[in-house]
Amino acid sequence: MVENSIHETPDGSHPDKPATAFTPLLTTHDWNEEWKELQKARRAADDASHWDKRAATFGSKDAPNPYVERFLDLAGIRPGESVLDMGCGTGALSVPLGAAGHPVVAADFSQGMLGVLEDELAERGIVSVTPKLMSWEDDWAAHGVLHDSADVAVASRSIATADLKDSLMRLTDAARRRVCITLPTGGSPRTDERVLTALGLQNQLGRDYLYAFAILAEEGLKPEVSYIESARPDTFDTPEEAYETFSRMVDDAVGSLVTTAERDAALARLRPWLADNLVENPRAGLPGRKGEPEKRLALREPRKVSWAFIAWDK
């Protein structure tokens, strides 16, 4: 009798038969390229001239201190360590770091923001912070930011670039010991996800922190993630101002992803939602986050922005 040369396993399968092909996206997908594709549908990042104009409304004194304190606590910067603060703005991190004696290179692409920072440093007599006009896309080496040029590199709420991986790797290259960044967990710090949900809209853009984590892991790094909650108490003089503000938010968040009919239907729901959620602001006239007087109306529940704090050691 001739024995069958093909043997079956107890479950009836053939051990020498190829398994069904399977490609795990998590470990094979190019997350940076997908992130770039998403950017095509997002609102364009503000340029340097925009931030130059806004600089007058900013100041490190007016920075949200709970956010800054939490960032610095999580960063774990050691006494005397040097810091690269990329996208420093008016110095929300650079000023307290400089006041604590850290040598800081404070880089930003807005001369207006750096001007406010320089005034603050002069007023407080801080000499260990060096402002530097430099963008994410510039040749950092040409600006003196070389490999391992700082003990710690930070980018607080400032990664608004065309290439997420390139920005993350630039920070990694510049740091000797540690890198710390924050990215919004939602679509944008300008977006109130509650409003979008109430209007029947879904923001499919953003979630940059998930892409950053995946990119860093692909590069063999071990990112750690924590979260910082930051309140944004928006105020308005009139219901119409609130309507116009949130209409712009809708267009920025999902304008390229919905039809005109869907947009019009969402905005039709906005006025009733505002009627239910706008209240008299008990802090009207008092200094707000940026030092300007708060306006007459506010949302019943202030908007909250959740930031993902991502750090990795080298």
Locations of the language-model features?
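Short alpha-helix
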Residues: L205-G220
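Class I SAM-dependent methyltransferase "Motif I" SAM/SAH-binding loop
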Residues: G87-G91
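Class I SAM-dependent methyltransferase SAM/SAH-binding core
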Residues: V95-D139
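A conserved beta-strand element that flanks and buttresses the S-adenosyl-L-methionine
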Residues: V154
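Conserved class I S-adenosyl-L-methionine
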Residues: E3-G76, R178-Q204
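Conserved Class I S-adenosyl-L-methionine
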Residues: Y227-K314
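A short, conserved alpha-helix within the catalytic core of class I
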Residues: A160-T172
